[in-house]
Amino acid sequence: MKLKERLAELIPQWRAEVAEIRKKYGNRKTMDCTIGHAYGGMRGLKALVCDTSEVFPDEGVKFRGYTIPELREGPHKLPTAEGGFEPLPEGLWYLLLTGELPTEEDVKEISAEFTKRMQNVPQYVFDVLRAMPVDTHPMTMFAAGILAMQRESVFAKRYEEGMRREEHWEAMLEDSLNMLAALPVIAAYIYRRKYKGDTHIAPDPNLDWSANLAHMMGFDDFEVYELFRLYMFLHSDHEGGNVSAHTNLLVNSAYSDIYRSFSAAMNGLAGPLHGLANQEVLRWIQMLYKKFGGVPTKEQLERFAWDTLNSGQVIPGYGHAVLRVTDPRYVAQRDFALKHLPDDELFKIVSLCYEVIPEVLKKHGKAKNPWPNVDAHSGVLLWHYGIREYDFYTVLFGVSRALGCTAQAILVRGYMLPIERPKSITTRWVKEVAESLPVAGS
């Protein structure tokens, strides 16, 4: 496989570079670590390495240095499906892994590899899912299905056989190819079992990774294929410090294989503070539609936004921990909606919110970022095309996030980074020594 051959050339170079950095600059500060960091979820603490993506306040996420508009529209546009516009996530995965823009041939090779391996999901995985009550939360089923596949791990087998550390990334790559191929199959199986009468659809060997997920869920429409390609591209990676990405790296640092680490990551993603935002936005938009009997006027929405804020509530889908501009992932989804569903009533409310709410938040004065984030839009797109099972939205998020999590895991195993082991402190210690500690920046 050309991807593996290219990584075999790049990873030894990167490993040497990382070793040199650790040797030369290992005692340099990235920033001051404060008591506030320890009690505040380590928010903003520069203590992890992630080379696949970086989030900038004024540009949003960059995948290996490229912005979303660059990769989606040019000048570095990723390959697309025949007759399509949206980037194929297979191409993004190549970029995340290598740091290089893929050719059409690179993308076709990865896509063909995924399609071939989709046929290899063991029957016992489906048996595990069938043994669970049908009303089990889809994210619980998703995490269980992933973990059930651990029996197939190449990394685990080779580690038991005494695999050299320099070879860890190769086994991680093989597991990642198998898991990424299996995820659409598992996700679609859960969807059909829970919501579509337990009838199931096999993968289509002629479809790409994202389109096959839509197909196996029962949505054979080119616009849905394009939406899934865009969705998987946009939600794929967002640095290494969010709950799902960090969980994946933490568990993986103990030499747990990708099935174990990514299953753990999905349990983090299932938490309401991480993976439920787009559902909350959609419910809020639908509540507005019901309250006003359709699309509200600008004045009605402005008054309702003020009432919401003055009652101490937040407006879902607006604001971001890092961004200080409209999330480029939101802009890409808005562009898709303007092209494919400009007359959708819920989209009209989303557009009106974009016009009204930032100005209200600016006047309110408490929001550091009054602009919409990625979650302000995605639920409405899924709803429009008939995917109306709120609880399943996080599974789609999880399938997408696997692209970034696998790429990060392969790279850190290539760098041969050690197990994570930060030092904890006690509240008693803080009370005893806090007054004597220097203030950050002093």
Swiss-Prot record:
The keyword Transferase applies. Pathway: Carbohydrate metabolism; tricarboxylic acid cycle; isocitrate from oxaloacetate: step 1/2. Gene3D superfamilies: Citrate Synthase, domain 1 (1.10.580.10), Cytochrome P450-Terp, domain 2 (1.10.230.10). InterPro entries: Citrate_synth-like_lrg_a-sub, Citrate_synth-like_sm_a-sub, Citrate_synthase, Citrate_synthase_AS, Citrate_synthase_sf. PROSITE patterns: CITRATE_SYNTHASE (PS00480). One of its GO terms (molecular function) is citrate (Si)-synthase activity. Pfam families: Citrate_synt. It catalyses: oxaloacetate + acetyl-CoA + H2O = citrate + CoA + H(+). Its EC number is 2.3.3.16. It is an enzyme of class 2 (transferase). The active site is at H274, H320, D375. Keywords: Transferase, Tricarboxylic acid cycle. GO terms for biological process: carbohydrate metabolic process; tricarboxylic acid cycle. Catalyzes both citrate generation and citrate cleavage. Part of a reversible tricarboxylic acid (TCA) cycle that can fix carbon dioxide autotrophically and may represent an ancestral mode of the conventional reductive TCA (rTCA) cycle. The direction is controlled by the available carbon source(s). Belongs to the citrate synthase family. This is Citrate synthase.
